[in-house]
Regions:
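Catalytic phosphate-donor-binding core of small-molecule kinases
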Residues: 1-16, 28-129
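AMP-binding/adenylate-forming core of the ANL superfamily
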Residues: 17-22
């Protein structure tokens, strides 16, 4: 059970396996497999997608991915993250002793991509999928 706040404003109490939070670069990976949108290159956005949400009459959540401004702070909190993990790219961190954490885009750090042939973003995207 996760309480989800966006920039200190309550959004929902989520019941399910977890949440995927990504930027444009990560939108073509795990986020896409969850039914999230692929974000166009150059857009500074955050996308929040549910992982295996439980949806019935007593447990409702947004149920759809949500695209947010890069300035949005995503806070996830729970009474117990026992046996939970936080995955960041290919790294995994246990979060047993944590009650809440905040995810945000950091202006000081950017990923630099090696660029090869000049191929449009949409042609690259089309060749991947």
């Amino acid at each position: 059970i996760l309480d989800v706040h966006l920039s200190d404003e309550y959004l929902e109490t989520f019941r399910g396996t977890g949440m995927c939070v990504c930027t444009q670069l990560g939108s073509t990976a795990y986020n896409r497999s969850l039914g999230g949108a692929v974000i166009q290159e150059g857009l500074d956005l955050i996308e929040l997608s549910e992982i295996a949400g439980i949806h019935h009459s007593k447990s409702r959540s947004l149920y759809a991915p949500i695209v947010l401004s890069k300035d949005t702070r995503v806070k996830l909190s729970s009474e117990s993250f026992e046996k939970a993990i936080l995955g960041v790219d290919s790294d995994v961190y246990p979060i047993d002793d944590i009650k809440e954490f905040e995810i945000r885009v950091c202006d000081q750090k950017r990923v630099r991509m090696i660029k090869g042939k000049k191929i449009s973003y949409f042609k690259k995207l089309n060749s991947l999928f």
